[in-house]
Amino acid sequence: MDDASRWECLHPDLVRLIGWRVLAGDLLDYVRFRAVCPLWRSSTVCPRGRGLVDERFHPRQWVLLPEGHELLPGHSKLHGYIRFFNTSTGLFVRARLPLFEDHRILDSVDGLVLLLQERDSAVRLLHPFTGDIAELPPLTTLVSAFAAKSDLSSGWDLADFMKFSATSVSVSAHGVITVMILLSRLWHVAFATSNGDRQWCVSSWSLSPTWRSVSFQGRLYILQRCRYNSDPQILQIDPPQHKEIGPPKLIATCPGKIQPPYHLVQCDTDVLAIGCSDKPNSLHLLVYKLADLILENFNPVVTIGGNVLFANTERSLSVSGRALPTMVGDTIVKTKPRDKHLGEYHLKGGTWLPTIDESTCGFEPSTGNLISRIFWCHYNWDKNEACFQRDTTPRLVKRNWRDEV
């Protein structure tokens, strides 16, 4: 019996167990695993049809990455293809998603894409690799729901309800999908489920005007400072129960030595809070684990597992250092304090280095290199808007990785 035949004769229970181990690493590796032979395919669970309702199949390591050069999702030159980037391995895949021909992107979370149909404002949650879709209420119902709770609703239009600070997706034991969205311009949280909901619901409470947010394990986390001289607080918003979303729960307080601008970012299995040191004229950054803050351990970390954090004012993202060979691990990419230029802050040494693409002139974000596109990726999902927001930020990374990938 040759080696190939031995693999084909594995017991189905063992194949299934190996498959779950592979899936814990990456969904697309699991798809390739199932394609090895008919036995392996029949012994493992097919992700199609379960891509949304079974959270094990959520492609969390994959982020939607625009092509650059103003080729936004839905552009005719892309022929329906969208590029995704694996934040753990650095691999790219292109998926053909015909829905983008008449849909626009509202947000993306855990590798899933929240879409708005332009014709009737229907909202859909899409799994880009299995094609599974969950139908959610039209976005126009969110406008009416907010109008019922706010006397100021007459000053808003639909565009104000399309700006999200964060989105979370959770799945109940019965397979009901709940989507929570944090409305950045309205300071409220809205939610809807896939269980036949006909309209979005809006929280009866609101947040303070300034915050940083992140989605993690189906919950929303908020970092905010209520007053100028108060310590920043971290709040947790749980999925709604019985059609009502409870107020944010205070779960941790950051020490006063962390100063704005703040950032929250999911990094591996942790949520990290980033801020500036309060020492006079200091350019140092401080990073705290949420788990440590909950235990009132206020010692900043000196390593982030070799990852690179992209701390943007809109969204922050963690990428494995293995996926970015031109970058040094344990680095934070963000605008320098008291400066509008992007820099690389090396956490272990406490030093800043410029991240400038010396071949370019001016301060527009580059559309041709990977690091720049990762940093700005949440600005350029929408085919109906400009590819990049104007900013005084120079281009990034070294000459040998400047070209389109």
Give, region by region, the residue ranges found by the protein language model:
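Beta-propeller blade signature
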Residues: 79-88, 190-195, 232-239, 282-295, ...
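A surface-exposed beta-alpha-beta supersecondary segment
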Residues: 149, 153-171, 294-388, 395
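A sequence/structural signal of beta-propeller blade repeats
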Residues: 94-285
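Short, solvent-exposed coil/turn segments at beta-strand boundaries
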Residues: 57-61, 88-89, 105-112, 168-177, ...
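General structural concept
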Residues: 15, 19-20, 29, 36-49, ...
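Cytosolic regulatory protein-protein interaction regions
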Residues: 245-337
